[in-house]
Amino acid sequence: MKRIIAFFIFLCAITIHATAQGWIGTWATAPQTVVKSFMPYNNNMSNRSVRQVVKVSIGGDMIRLKLSNIYSTEPVVIRSIYIAHAKDSFAIDPKSAKYLKFGNQYKVTIPAGKSITSDALPYDLKPLQRLAITINYTSAPTVPTVHMGSRT
């Protein structure tokens, strides 16, 4: 059985494929600390949603998401995260949308300097597919973990 795992670095994503030996990466980016001069004027993500669209290389039938708050000194509180097949631009196919859970809960808090991985979720992901990841934040750090090339 093929599996996929998506690692999400605060606003950046990594997708991983599972084999009998373990998980294998299919999309990746590196987490970075933010440089204040590169942040938008208002970077407050509290009570906002962010959608990141990634193009995976391999597909599978299971997905997980890993979120990182490794470079922040404040916790991140996430109300929910859902994934869906991305259509044109940032539109999604609503029939494909599925919510992720963390320890069987939709809401998750990521402590400062830590990462967390979602529960495995059955999901039909095709090779080279565009996947939309939508994160609904309750509160987020003023200086987040980012990837400077991803201005989402």
Language-model features: locations:
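Bacterial Sec-dependent N-terminal signal peptides
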Residues: 1-23
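N-terminal secretory targeting modules
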Residues: 19-152
